[in-house]
Design a protein with these regions (language model features):
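Face-selective signature of the C-terminal outer-membrane beta-barrel domain
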Residues: 1-85, 96, 152-155, 192-194, ...
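Residues that define the transmembrane beta-barrel architecture of outer-membrane proteins
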Residues: 2-4, 49-55, 85-87, 130-134, ...
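Residues on the lipid-exposed face of transmembrane beta-strands in outer-membrane beta-barrel proteins
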Residues: 6-12, 57-63, 91-95, 136-140, ...
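Repeated loop/turn-to-beta-strand initiation elements of outer-membrane beta-barrel proteins
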Residues: 16-20, 67-71, 99-103, 143-151, ...
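Transmembrane beta-strands of outer-membrane beta-barrel pores
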Residues: 26-32, 53-55, 75-81, 107-113, ...
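Outer-membrane beta-barrel signature, preferentially recognizing the C-terminal barrel domain
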Residues: 96, 102, 106-160, 167-197, ...
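Conserved C-terminal beta-signal and adjacent last beta-strands/turns
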Residues: 105, 132, 202-210, 231-339
Length: 339
């Protein structure tokens, strides 16, 4: 996969209360895949060579009628290949009643074309996703000498037509995309962060996230025995969470990450049989890093231990994931001198 990207933006303030932003972006994707099976299975989609241009234009108007209240209207137009999307508007509101507490709300139209992979493996039979999303929440932050914190809570609700969903076919040996006529997606996300610094270059930071996710199949029943309507989509956990802890001393860092995923069903009717569910699991990762600064570049090296406690788990039915494994990274960022 190769992608070329271009972007141009423009901003202008009209007084102290009105602000205009315009952005134009262009993506050119090139995808080439190879079927490396000794004998090609003609029942599966073959390797392909394809390309697509994606053009997106955005105009945003932001207005603050009062010091603690803001409103923004976004208008987006997209052209994918030779297909144009309808206008995609979004209305955003924010209110700061006191201190560093902000309430936010928005309503936005959704319209998403199938990706090149979606389109190919569905043999060009997919429809674009479309619908509306509503969300609202509150954010608060504060600070003291050498320390800072922040918390947020967000609720969202959406009805999406023609939801693009990948499902395991042929005994879970192949995944294929399809459209689900109507999906009701709603839930909540809570996050918190805290950071502290003390003498001699020491600092620490903790980030936590908890998500409650409901994605319900709301299409019309196919027949009287159809038990999939109103059920959670396969492989979508209702609960998930993550905690990341970073300890830093000068240019040395240690990161610990904990993830949790609740039970996930593998069938559309949420069958409770053994082969119809994937049990909850925890995941723990630990990494170490060191940064170096040179006149010609910034360099960072890292060592990571994935699945620290050698947990046995699956993310897909009958496909065990690796036990404890290790990784090494090297990142070089050149530092160009200006004349």
């Amino acid at each position: 996969i190769h992608t070329l990207f271009g972007d141009a933006g423009w901003e202008m303030g009209l007084g102290e209360r009105f602000y205009l932003v315009a952005d134009l972006s262009l993506l050119q994707h090139f995808v080439y895949t190879v079927n490396d099976k000794p004998v090609r299975d003609t029942s599966e989609p073959s390797a392909y060579d394809d390309a697509r241009t994606e053009l997106s234009a955005l105009v945003s108007a932001r207005y603050r009628p009062a010091e603690r209240f803001g409103i923004a209207l976004n208008l987006r137009q997209e052209v994918i290949g030779n297909e144009g999307a309808p206008f995609i508007p979004a209305l955003l509101l924010d209110w700061n009643p006191f201190g560093r507490v902000v309430f936010k709300a928005s309503v936005a139209r959704n319209y998403r074309f199938p990706t090149l992979n979606d389109r190919h493996f569905a043999k060009n039979m997919l429809l674009p996703e479309e619908g509306f999303t509503y969300d609202g929440g509150v954010e608060a932050e504060g600070s003291a000498e050498g320390a800072s914190y922040g918390v947020s809570l967000t609720f969202y609700d959406s009805y999406i037509r023609n939801w693009i969903f990948w499902y395991p076919d042929k005994g879970a040996t192949q995944w294929l995309p399809t459209n689900i006529r109507l999906v009701h997606a709603f839930g909540a996300e809570a996050s918190a962060r805290a950071a502290v610094e003390w003498g001699r270059g020491w600092s620490a930071r903790v980030d936590a996230l908890l998500a409650w996710t409901r994605s319900l199949n709301m299409r019309e029943p196919l027949n009287e025995a159809d038990n999939a309507v109103g059920k959670q989509l396969p492989y979508v956990p209702v609960w998930s969470g993550a905690v990341t802890v970073r300890l830093q001393w000068r240019s040395w860092t240690v990161d610990y990450k904990w993830n949790y995923y609740s039970e996930r069903f593998t069938t559309t009717d949420n069958s409770a049989m053994i082969t119809g569910r994937i049990v909850p699991y925890f995941m723990n990762d630990l990494s170490f890093g060191k940064a170096f600064r040179f006149r010609w570049a910034d360099l960072s090296v890292g060592f990571k231990v994935n699945n620290l406690f050698d947990e046995e788990y699956e993310t897909e039915l009958s496909r065990p994931m690796p036990g404890r494994n290790y990784g090494f990274s090297l990142e070089i960022t050149p530092r160009f001198r200006h004349p």
